[in-house]
Amino acid sequence: MSSDGTPGRKRSAKVRSSVSGLEIEVLREAGDWESSTDETVRRAAEHAYAVARGDESAELCIVLGDDALVAKLNKAYRGKEGPTNVLSFPAAEMPDTGAPEAVFGGATPLLGDVVLARETIAREALDQNKKFADHLSHLTVHGVLHLLGHDHMEDVDADEMEALERDILEDLGIADPYGADHPGQ
């Protein structure tokens, strides 16, 4: 039982990246996550942020959930039935001013939350012949890029976002998640 009395909920200490100005909190909300998961998602998030945004200070929360939690959020916020692999909830649009202090009054801006679904990610990794940690890293990168304003609604935007994901993942030593070696993409 956690300090707030909720079974299964566990907050990690906020960790400020030495690579970027990103402060990351990992919240284990639900699901059977490996002990190494916190480090996997932190590494992916900080690298995505460093590549896409630079060294500006910011905070984000990564929520480790299960299919039931993500299905509930998916229905409530997107009107869609069932779980998905990752959801992103931006706290505010990050204006491209180059100086977040000017917009956020000196406070560290909160990017938002990235919520991951354990069972869906495991199922997809198996179906697509990917390592679980690699697929988890990809979806974490994907979620962080959404918090930074990237989307894939139009083909040109999808191409740009996927290229950025490929570059970030290559830096992390992870194969192209959209390549021919991964069916189902």
From Swiss-Prot:
Identify the coding gene.
ybeY
Residues binding Zn(2+) are 142, 146, 152
Q: Which Pfam family would be a valid example here?
A: YbeY
How cofactor binds (record note)? Binds 1 zinc ion.
Q: What class of enzyme is it?
A: hydrolase
The places in or outside the cell where this protein is found are: Cytoplasm
Which superkingdom does the taxonomy of this entry point to?
Bacteria
Concerning PANTHER family, the annotation shows: ENDORIBONUCLEASE YBEY, CHLOROPLASTIC
Enumerate the UniProt keywords alphabetically.
Answer: Cytoplasm, Endonuclease, Hydrolase, Metal-binding, Nuclease, Ribosome biogenesis, rRNA processing, Zinc
For this record, the Gene Ontology CC terms, alphabetical, are: cytoplasm
Family per record: Belongs to the endoribonuclease YbeY family.
What cofactors does the UniProt entry give for this protein? Zn(2+)
InterPro entries in UniProt: MetalPrtase_cat_dom_sf_prd (IPR023091), YbeY (IPR002036), YbeY_CS (IPR020549)
| GO terms, biological process | rRNA processing
Q: Does the keyword field hold Zinc?
A: yes
What does the protein in this record do?
A: Single strand-specific metallo-endoribonuclease involved in late-stage 70S ribosome quality control and in maturation of the 3' terminus of the 16S rRNA.
What is the name of this protein? Endoribonuclease YbeY
One annotated GO molecular function is:
metalloendopeptidase activity
The EC number on file is 3.1.-.-
Q: Which organism is it from?
A: Parvibaculum lavamentivorans (strain DS-1 / DSM 13023 / NCIMB 13966)
